[in-house]
Amino acid sequence: LSVASYFFDDDGVLAKDTQIIKDGILVAGLSDLASATQLGTVPTGNGRRESCRRKAYARMTNTFFEKGTDKLEDMIASIKHGYMLFETSNGMEDPKNWAIQCVAQYGIEIVDGKLTDNYVSPVVMSGYVPDLLKSISMISDDFEISGAGSCGKGYKEWVRVSDGGPALKARVKLG
């Protein structure tokens, strides 16, 4: 459990784990009671609102990738040139066009499989979600959850969330 955990969502639906992707296939989305009814699916228990004066929206809670089997050192060693990114925040998605953007507070350059002393900050990542997910080639065996985030919708509609998981080796557009 984390600061974003709850037993019932704000629609009164029992909270449960929702596996979004399984074996590389999108198997479920997050829903609140209204969206599940409209789509003819079972609600996932993700209807959350900032306060009783606000509308419930489908929101993330504790969102993460499950750990893999790769050692972080092996992942770094496999990279000819790239960046290891840290402290991601400010994620934003476009559900209609499958675009994503988020910010890492800093990155460390990797050259010939070794971390360098070259730091960059901040780092903006962007891309097309299916391409990003398909590009994941390694997943570390470590796992860490951070509970200090929030998910925003509409005008000043914030709820607490956690995210994290293992390190991922993927191709993303940096700016």
Predicted segments, located by residue:
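N-terminal small-residue-enriched
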Residues: 1-175
